[in-house]
Swiss-Prot record:
Keyword Ion transport: yes
Induction of the gene: Repressed by fur. Induced by Btr in iron-limited conditions.
Originating gene: feuA
Keyword match Ion transport: yes
Protein name (Swiss-Prot/TrEMBL): Iron-uptake system-binding protein
GO biological process, one term: iron coordination entity transport
Signal peptide, first to last residue: 1-19
Length: 317
């Protein structure tokens, strides 16, 4: 009788454990969403076979993908470090990440150790670098061109199962753009606005569809200065050229990391008599770091933030 009771007790405990295991498995399944499987993904006319959805993503070189991850709340397995650390801008998504190297200096050995399902690299990398990175796993070179911002975000959304969220972000941006564009046209339609970036103590301007210009001129429709229209890439400018353009509004982007050798470059600029003579300066229409200075300008995150800043700054008296 005792043997039967003991057997029943063991059986009961086994069934309870199985039930708990099943429940935990079910909970884990719900938390992870759809079961991962190999799928073919189309991105900029190329096909990649990847495991989706996945959070085993290593980002190297593509700050654009880091910004998309921030907007979609994706926490990658590996992320780009800046001067050996993750900057505050990305602290909310790098809590589980290991560094994959600096922006243009990928650590291939470290990425290999991670064994990621997919590596998001950058089209800025030379072909030889991309070949080396691809030895660590399936590698997708993510475009650094502003006009591909939607495709870039949808790529990460497909990899992580967040397509619905990405589509809503795009739809919300386009709706906000319509409303803000109307307000700006009423207030600043004929105003001249310029975005400059200070790097290594020098002043740079960008082509009409590059950096934040893609939003300022491309989306909002403000007229680009001739110097911006003529620029073919990041272009060194000067105070004398700024004086010739004499914009009504100036957006200044200044990062300490990019001016480590000349930390007082912005202060020195602001003291310069030519700078002080500019219309935008006289009218207090100079906006320093209205968006985080590490932002790439042509991503969904950058566009959403810059649109908000432009709406505020360009419609003020």
């Amino acid at each position: 009788m005792k043997k039967i009771s003991l057997t029943l007790l063991i059986l009961l405990l086994a069934l309870t454990a199985a039930a708990c295991g099943s429940k935990n498995e079910s909970t884990a399944s719900k938390a992870s969403g759809t079961a991962s499987e190999k799928k073919k993904i189309e991105y900029l006319d190329k096909t990649y076979e990847v495991t989706v959805p996945t959070d085993k993503i290593a980002i190297t070189g593509s700050v654009e993908s880091m910004e998309d991850a921030k907007l979609l709340d994706v926490h990658p397995q590996g992320a780009i470090s800046f001067s050996g650390k993750f900057p505050d801008m990305f602290k909310d998504i790098t809590d589980k990440a290991e560094p994959t190297g600096e922006k243009m200096e990928p650590n291939i050995e470290k990425i290999l150790e991670m064994k990621p399902d997919v590596i998001l690299a950058s089209t800025k990398f030379p072909e030889k670098t991309l070949q080396k990175i691809s030895t660590a796993g399936t590698t997708i070179p993510v475009s650094h061109i502003s006009s591909n911002w939607k495709e870039n975000m949808m790529l990460l959304a497909q990899l992580t199962g967040k397509e619905k969220k990405a589509k809503k972000i795009i739809a919300d941006y386009e709706q906000d753009l319509k409303e803000i564009k109307t307000k700006i046209n009423d207030k600043a339609k004929d105003s001249k606005a310029l975005v400059i970036r200070i790097r290594q103590g020098n002043i740079y301007i960008y082509p009409e569809q590059v950096y934040f210009n893609s939003t300022l001129y491309g989306d909002l429709g403000l007229k680009a200065p001739n110097e911006v229209k003529a620029a073919k890439a990041q272009e060194l400018s000067s105070l004398e050229k700024l004086s010739e353009m004499n914009p009504d509004h100036i957006f200044v982007q200044f990062s300490d990391d990019e001016n480590a050798d000349k930390p007082d470059a912005l202060k020195d600029l602001e003291k310069n008599p030519i700078w002080k003579s500019l219309k935008a300066v006289k009218e207090d229409h100079v906006y320093v770091n209205s968006v985080d200075p590490l932002a790439q300008g042509g991503t969904a995150w950058s566009k959403v933030r810059f649109l908000k800043a432009a709406a505020e700054k360009l419609t003020q008296n």
